[in-house]
Amino acid sequence: MPIVAMTVNGQSVSAEVEGRTLLVQFLREFLHLTGTHVGCDTSQCGCCTVHVDGVGVKSCSLLALACDGATVTTIEGLAVDGKLHPMQEAFHEYHGLQCGFCTPGMIMSAVDMVNRSGNDLDAQTIRAQLAGNLCRCTGYHNIVKAIQAGAAAMQGAEMPVTAGSSGIGEPVRRKEDLRLITGKGCFSDDVNLPRQVYAVMVRSPHGHARILAIDIQHALASPGVLAVLTARDMLADGLRPIPHHPFALHPADIRMVNTDGTPVFAAPHYPLAPDKARYVGEAVAMVIADTVAAAKDGAELVGVDYAALPAVTNTIAAAQPDAPRVWDEASSNVCLDADVGDRDATAAAFARAAHIVKFETWVQRVTGVPMEPRAAVGAYDAATGQYTLYAGSSGAVRLKDDLATMLNVPAATVRVVMHDVGGHFGTRGMIYPEFALVAWAARRVGRPVKWTCERIEAFVSDYQGRDLAVEAELALDADGNFLAMRGSNIGNAGAHTGNFSPLQKGVEIMSSIYRVPAAHFRARAVVSNTTPTRPYRSAGRPEVIFVMERLIDLAARQCGFDRVELRRRNLLTEAELPYTNPFGMIYDSGAYHEVMEKALVLGDWADFAERRAEARQRGKCRGIGVANYVDTATGVPRERAEVTVHPEGRVDVIIGTVSTGQGHETSFAQLVTEWLGVPIENVRIRTGDTDFVKVGGGTHSGRGMRLASIVIWNSSQQIIAKGTRLAALLLRCEPSEIRFRDGRFAMTGGDRSVGLFDVAAGAMQLTDLPDDLRGPLAACSDETVNVASFPYGSHVCEVEIDPELGSVEVVRYAAVDDVGRAVNPLIIDGQVHGGIAQGVGQALLEQCFYDSATGQLLSGSFMDYSMPRADNFPFFATQLSEVPSPTHPLGMRPAGEGGTTPALGVVINAVVDALADYGVKHVEMPATPERVWRAVIANAKRFG
């Protein structure tokens, strides 16, 4: 093999490489510089950006041999003598990252941008030049701010450093940033074990086909191939199907059952398809080899004999009695057919209505696309029978339990470890087939097995989201009061009956935060020959809020009401709360009117007419929209925190959530700083390893901070109570004479005190202590919270459309979101920005396109799936409302999903408003230039 030599981060390196070795592979696999990430394999995402001879390049599209003799700088080499580069400092100071997976590429691209274009960069220039870099978390708002500040600092400007306290309510800069901005994070593909081998999946090219035979002989003879495993091996070894949990597990969520009393259809989802492939990308075999290249070569030689069958992909088509059946065991593709609400009361209300507004829509299928592709390493210890899985997910404990079920072994023999996780959004919320496969394969071959998903593979194998067909009606009286709503929702579960919770959690808030006395909906779930769907950010709520907000705008237009006044008339007032909506959900509290009024001011609704007139003079159409929302935050109700105060000056918190970009290492530490009075740098949050995390529901459904705050508070109070008794012994007084404040136990009326860490030392050193005071100063709180939380808010969006091109530009976006009590406003704002971007992305850009005849995914790469980029957005105007929730002991509401929930509705409301002069009543999502242009042309012809 040829030898390549180059200088990397100031060091001369050389190695023998295959001719097909890419620069990114050389950096990661030969030099172990894992800060350079691979996010797409097609040079579309920018995660792999490095500098070659001082110029930014995408290392996934450059051969290592092409860099022979070159000077290469990676993110690990950007800091000099331990001092952060100004651009790294700026990303930290301006919260320019969340999960951190795209961040090294962003920073390297930003430095290159400054080197090419100078230090005086405006936002428009930055957004345009950053179009080659993707971020799924941030919405780019803070990234652009960071690059502006970093560019100035590279020219010598002083970087502002935020100072102040580190307790609740402070915009503390994130602790985890320092490893992520320097390339020292540890994502799943960064994990490598001694003697590991590599897995590649053989996936079905058919949307629906019977598997007749699999020939593995040629693959087994391929150099480097160690094993080829099929469903026959899987079944012989006793592997079980994925233990799906189809419905939301929280007691507060509504229950859905088939109206005819039959069981809800549930199909076995094996990690390798044993009889039929039911969607393009379903794994049918696995090749294990010494190298990834050898495994890929072997996979090409696996011969699978298929008998193609008719496929069905469309949601409504799948519900028809004569549709091709995805599962032979079922009588139809409808696996759930439920009724919710009051049919009779709703019918009576419609009978007396002065106005009835109808709306039919399909909320298209999208995919979460975390920037980190999935990866997993499985290991097996034959001596102990212990399995270990290294993989990113939303929670280690749930993954461990599900993995043990699939492997058919006791949970005690399974360990799950996860480090940094590059985005979640619901896509990582459940176990995947490959996680069980690598653990099983490790036992079969006697060596650790690693699998890394390529992006094109992720598009067909990652769980997808949304895909809801809706028919809805809204009844109003002559004055515009809402009387009732009714309709039908059909959710597309994909090929497997994995999860109906988006359908369930959506329909339960179909009426949103409006006064709707009666409602009735039919809720159905169907299977189809498409990738399985799961909850995607805000699971089911963006779809139904979209429907409700479109109904209101349609009603205003059809019946002659003002859009804002119609909302004011029907929004619930604070005096009406708590309020039971027509589906049985109890909204605890909220200043719904106040939040909408704030959003209208923030979005400058009052002066919109002037901006519209100015746009018309330029031949453009300008529109504005408003949307109100409520979320139901439930999720797994149980969480536990174990808090230990160490005498050497550290507080450890063990908890079952996992940060996938939310900043738990910082915001959870702020809680401890507030309540125990210790410096934030002395608090360590420990998660993601089932060797020490024994209980926890993970991070989903807005449960992270909501439940963590409760159990950390309880544990902190226990520590203070225990510490008070210990301090009394140390100070030789009564516990009633002790007061705890700012990390110290002090005697009242005197100057004697002892610090928290000294008390912890005393607990370990004192003799003759009561039994309950002996040992470490520690406490544990294990709570099950059976009440839901209802974050809410109001968003205003303004768009400008070129009617000749159909192009839509979001020119303003304002959001007011109520979070009850904000722990870290900086982090929350970042969460809102990212949520908005994902919602706007669905409204204008994103869709999983399937060929209806074959089930082929036609949008299977970043070249085909239109992801939001930096130049798709303006800066966002965001504001937090803090009305304490009475159902949370600290008044908190979740904040991670609210940005997405109203975004679909507010954007399309603005688009339709912009096209009002053309008589356009609705534009389906995504409102692409072609779709908007066709709406303009069709209505221009109609109206002459």
What are these regions (language model features)?
Residues 151-331, 356, 444:
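Flexible, low-hydrophobicity surface segments
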Residues 179, 300-313, 394-396, 401, ...:
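Extended active-site and interfacial segments that coordinate phosphate-rich ligands
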Residues 424-446, 450-452, 664-672:
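Thiamine diphosphate
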Residues 66, 78-79, 234, 393-396, ...:
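Acidic, glycine-rich active-site loops and adjacent beta-strand->loop/helix elements
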Residues 95, 170, 176-179, 250-267, ...:
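Glycine-rich loop/linker segments at domain edges
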